[in-house]
Amino acid sequence: MHPIATAVVAAFAVFAPAAAQEPARTARIERIDPALDTLIAADAPIERVATGFGFTEGPLWHDGKLWFSDVVGDKLRTVDRAGKVTELLANSGGLANPPAGASIGSNGLIPDRDGSVLMAQMGARQIVRVDAAGKVTPFLSAYQGKRLNSPNDLVYAPDGALWFTDPPFGLFNGMDKDPKKELPNNPVFRYAGGKLDAVITDLKLPNGIGLSPKGDTLYIADYGQATIFAYKVARDGAVSDRRSFFTFPKGPGGGADGLKVDLRGNVWATGPGGIWIFSPAGKTLGRIHMPETAANLAFGEQGDALWITASTSIYRVPIKGVGALPMFAR
């Protein structure tokens, strides 16, 4: 989730005007290290597949289409390879009578074991299941009797545990200062065996989330610190040895928001100007400069395509078969 502009709260609320005012930027791929050549061609086309949305987020390749959220339009949609857009669910954020322009739609999406999709609802402050017909059923909404902040992004670990970030972006009356906020912090949660644990509680604005191929390294993009943090993950889900994986320089066009980890353990993350690609050791391999502010990304098709949600549009970039599809993807 990316705070572009605000008319409701400082740092996070109204997206459409800011998206319309973005300065013109040239789409291109920047090769910083020769290792990038094994991941993506320097002349790979950056294709705008669909446009005209409020602010796009939460991309997921599922059932042969890209599912995505419009956090301002408050809709869940799909788009196919040909650019055909289908509305799957209106009021995807689940909040009755939402204020105009607030970022309270749905956000992160991930396939679940039964073929449905888990969806983070910023407005209703919960995670729900959505089936192919758009039917919604509750999944997670509280921790120790207190309502979640506004779940943002999700990932399944190889052991079947669900991890997700819970920043206050959907609390549109001041985020951390919103009187409706019940949790004392902005946790990273792990759900396994029917039990929800707040594993990390000391980040400012935890946002994007990803795991290494073996599930032994957890990556969290903290928008509030412009940093991707990495943690060791034990078999029981305990985390340790936090380190700063990468701190983004200041710049226009995005921040520490969405991220994904490919089959080789490379980290693809949104940052200023577009998508940044890092080796497992944190070395910058290259960048995809985007014409709009990128909020999130997803590997799709046969692992040979990168789909990007960026402001008002959906983009696709061919890659070299390294994309890791999420667990339970089909």
Q: Which residues are covered by each model-predicted region?
A:
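Flexible "stalk/tail and boundary" regions
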Residues: 45, 63-64, 79-82, 113-114, ...
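A short loop-to-beta-strand structural motif that recurs across blades of beta-propeller domains
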Residues: 75-77, 126-128, 186-189, 227-229, ...
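Beta-propeller fold detector
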Residues: 47-50, 86-93, 137-141, 198-201, ...
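Beta-rich, blade/repeat-based domains predominating
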Residues: 50-65, 94-121, 144-162, 182-188, ...
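Short loop/turn segments immediately following the C-termini of beta-strands
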Residues: 71, 122, 167-169, 223, ...
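Short, conserved, GDST-rich strand-edge loop motifs in beta-rich repeat architectures
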Residues: 22, 164-183
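Short loop/turn segments immediately following beta-strands, especially the blade-tip
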Residues: 231-238, 319-326
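Blade/loop signatures of beta-propeller domains
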Residues: 21-45, 326-328
